[in-house]
């Protein structure tokens, strides 16, 4: 027997896990992508959303591309939902589907075993607000794993290297949520190895870039795919009167990060 979850699943959170754990059926997810109102503040891209669902919900995933299949709610039900042969459907109170924007109450008339979940403080919009307001640790408590980005290391101007802090530079995806500029404590996953460091997010021409200084690491990793997880916000972006002042600020960030990491159970963050 199967339970079908329908939604964007942008940032898998503890609420999703609770629903899965309290369902009697095998989970399936109908993941909605490319909604008609183009969204530019996604927490994660499609690839990461699918990966999180498979990892944490242990669910099979069907992706429905709205842009490629523009249809009304009845057609969506007949062509997409019915073919999945589910025994239960789970949607949120704020969920609307089809180009005629029908809701869960309408769906329940067609499919009796539809569960409509009330919107709570466990939602992607709440998590976005926490990230926007520099309340990173609150966001991370709601997510199934602390907020992260994935990117390829590119060449930079290497100015930080001259100050004694070589960095791995990753260009941020401009379709995702614009993160606040400033310094962060980060965890870096590179070639299945875990490192820690400080990440500095700043604007470089048209791109938002994260320059990450990895502690006790000085290898050349250009072109490598890395996953960097934001653990704690340190400070907002500042202008410095001299290179010496900038170097002092970076060293202060590093010292703060090292002390903070010493006091954490790293297996639980």
UniProtKB/Swiss-Prot annotation:
Keywords: ATP-binding, FAD, Flavoprotein, FMN, Kinase, Multifunctional enzyme, Nucleotide-binding, Nucleotidyltransferase, Transferase. GO terms for molecular function: ATP binding; FMN adenylyltransferase activity; riboflavin kinase activity. InterPro entries: Cyt_trans-like (IPR004821), FAD_synthase (IPR015864), Riboflavin_kinase (IPR023468), Riboflavin_kinase_bac (IPR002606), Riboflavin_kinase_bac/euk (IPR015865), Riboflavin_kinase_dom_sf (IPR023465), Rossmann-like_a/b/a_fold (IPR014729). Its EC number is 2.7.1.26, 2.7.7.2. The keyword Nucleotide-binding applies. The keyword Flavoprotein applies. NCBIfam families: cyt_tran_rel, ribF. Belongs to the RibF family. This is Bifunctional riboflavin kinase/FMN adenylyltransferase. It comes from Mycoplasma genitalium (strain ATCC 33530 / DSM 19775 / NCTC 10195 / G37) (Mycoplasmoides genitalium). The lineage of its organism: Bacteria, Bacillati, Mycoplasmatota, Mycoplasmoidales, Mycoplasmoidaceae. The gene is ribF.
């Amino acid at each position: 027997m199967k339970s079908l979850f329908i939604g964007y699943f942008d940032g898998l959170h503890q609420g999703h896990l609770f629903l899965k754990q309290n369902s009697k059926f095998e989970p399936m997810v109908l993941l909605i992508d490319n909604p008609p109102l183009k969204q530019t503040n996604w927490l994660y891209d499609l690839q990461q959303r699918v990966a999180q669902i498979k990892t944490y919900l242990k669910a099979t995933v069907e992706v429905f591309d709205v842009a490629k299949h523009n249809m009304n709610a009845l057609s969506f039900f007949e062509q997409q939902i019915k073919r999945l042969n589910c025994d239960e459907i789970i949607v949120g109170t704020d969920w609307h589907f089809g180009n005629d924007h029908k809701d869960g109450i309408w769906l329940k008339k067609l499919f009796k075993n539809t569960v409509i979940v009330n919107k709570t403080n466990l939602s992607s919009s709440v998590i976005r607000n926490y990230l926007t307001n520099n309340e990173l640790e609150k966001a991370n408590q709601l997510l199934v794993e602390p907020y992260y980005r994935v990117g390829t290391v590119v060449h930079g101007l290497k100015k930080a290297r001259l100050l004694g802090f070589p960095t791995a530079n990753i260009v941020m995806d401009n379709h995702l949520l614009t993160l606040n500029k400033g310094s962060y404590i980060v965890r870096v996953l590179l070639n299945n190895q875990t490192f820690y460091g400080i990440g500095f997010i700043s604007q470089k021409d048209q791109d938002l870039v994260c320059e990450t200084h990895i502690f006790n690491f000085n290898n050349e990793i250009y072109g490598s795919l890395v996953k960097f997880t934001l653990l704690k916000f340190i400070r907002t972006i500042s202008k410095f009167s001299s290179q010496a002042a900038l170097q002092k600020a970076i060293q202060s960030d590093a010292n703060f990060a090292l002390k903070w990491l010493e006091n954490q159970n790293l297996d639980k963050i």
